[in-house]
Curated annotation (Swiss-Prot):
Residues 87-88, 116-120, 150-156 are annotated as: Interaction with DNA. It is found in: Cytoplasm. This is Negative modulator of initiation of replication. One of its GO terms (biological process) is regulation of DNA-templated transcription. GO terms for molecular function: sequence-specific DNA binding. It comes from Shigella dysenteriae serotype 1 (strain Sd197). Belongs to the SeqA family. The lineage of its organism: Bacteria, Pseudomonadati, Pseudomonadota, Gammaproteobacteria, Enterobacterales. Gene3D superfamilies: Met repressor-like (1.10.1220.10), Replication modulator SeqA, C-terminal DNA-binding domain (1.20.1380.10).
Length: 181
């Protein structure tokens, strides 16, 4: 077994082709390259991988639900997420990531998300402040959205749950994400 270094983008692409838990990188690459261990010696594999790599990087235009799930799992395992000491910071990072995965679905989810007397998301800070001076609005990084942040962790979880359900994430992932806030 040899070790090779790949950049993050290529790693993510290869990981996005995982078919089952525990599948090795070698198995994934063999399947992607339609290569079997018995058919050719090791040297041509290296050549084949190098030729195929540029095509792999370019062939990543649309995010499927599997890609979105993988991206959320990668976020939960990331150092950036682990370094967040406060629930509000994890909440903000989750919102930013969800938006980056599918801006349209995120927009649709947030439009239907509001409390009895409160608006949770808006395009500007003033709209949120109109619904209460103590809402502590914060801008969601990388998005046109502002969100109120003076809610308890349970409310933050239910907001994330609503958005993820609307974006058609699997229930077990939603539960896992909410458990980390």
């Amino acid at each position: 077994m040899k070790t090779i270094e790949v950049d993050d983008e290529l790693y993510s692409y290869i990981a996005s082709h995982t078919k089952h838990i525990g599948e090795s990188a070698s198995d994934i690459l063999r399947r992607m390259l339609k290569f079997s261990a018995a058919s050719q010696p090791a040297a041509p594999v290296t050549k084949e991988v190098r030729v195929a790599s540029p095509a792999i990087v370019e062939a990543k235009p649309v995010k499927t639900i599997k890609d979105k799930v993988r991206a959320m799992r990668e976020l939960l395992l990331s150092d950036e997420y682990a370094e967040q000491k406060r629930a509000v910071n994890r909440f903000m990072l989750l919102l930013s990531t969800l938006y980056s995965l599918d801006a349209q679905a995120f927009a649709e989810a947030t439009e239907s998300l509001h409390g009895r007397t409160r608006v949770y998301f808006a395009a500007d800070e003033q709209t949120l402040l109109k619904n209460g001076n103590q809402t502590k609005p914060k801008h969601v990084s990388g998005t046109p959205y502002w969100v109120i942040t003076n809610t308890n962790t349970g409310r933050k979880c239910s907001m994330i749950e609503h958005i993820m359900l609307s974006m058609q994430f699997p229930a077990e992932l939603i539960e896992k994400v909410c458990g980390t806030i």
